[in-house]
Amino acid sequence: MATIPIVIETTGRTERAYDIYSRLLRDRIILLGSAVDDYVANLICAQLLFLESEDPEKEIFMYINSPGGVVSAGLAIYDTMQYVMPPVSTLCLGQAASMGALLLCAGATGMRYALPHSRIMIHQPSGGYQGQATDIEIHAKETRRTRETLNEIMAKHTGQSMERIQVDTERDNFMSAEEAVAYGLIDKVLTSRERLEKKDAE
């Protein structure tokens, strides 16, 4: 198991220890740094709801480095991002693949970013089923419906047509950060924090 760093803050004569993720949360930063499953989704959703209760207007920053994961868990995060009142800014570092890419493009308009060497990948949902033929048919139908839902979400946030999304997600489709801008998955490639702060000040 990986060790979670602890940071110490000193205020006057008082010292307080935080794990690194709790300290980032104080600055309204959420890190999605793993595959998406129900446990991770519950943590992310809880953080979004907490930050909304702290300040319903102040921006939330979500950093994404994820290979994707369970669709239902990812959609729980997506729906919560859209539900909360504060705008959610997204930034990809490393990779945002599959459900990670969908969450990346679901950030507030004009506030979706990637670092220069990030990799974004979109594709159709996949799954394997076994059992009776009727059950397999039921699951296949549900997978097709899920794909339609994901395509609709991506079309909404990228401005691409449903037909284009359908074709482009047929197989694994990798993009550089610059290509993701052209496609509409993100709004800008950032090379330094100063560029982000200048944009926010404009």
Swiss-Prot record:
Alphabetized Gene3D superfamilies for the sequence: 2-enoyl-CoA Hydratase, Chain A, domain 1
The keyword Iron is assigned to this record: no
Subcellular location(s) per record: Cytoplasm
Superkingdom of source: Bacteria
Main enzyme class: hydrolase
Signal peptide (residue range): none
Amino-acid biosynthesis listed as a keyword: no
CDD domains (UniProt xref): S14_ClpP_2
GO molecular function per UniProt: ATP-dependent peptidase activity; ATPase binding; serine-type endopeptidase activity
NCBIfam families, A to Z: clpP, PRK00277.1, PRK12553.1
Subunit structure: Fourteen ClpP subunits assemble into 2 heptameric rings which stack back to back to give a disk-like structure with a central cavity, resembling the structure of eukaryotic proteasomes.
Primary role: Cleaves peptides in various proteins in a process that requires ATP hydrolysis. Has a chymotrypsin-like activity. Plays a major role in the degradation of misfolded proteins.
Protein name: ATP-dependent Clp protease proteolytic subunit
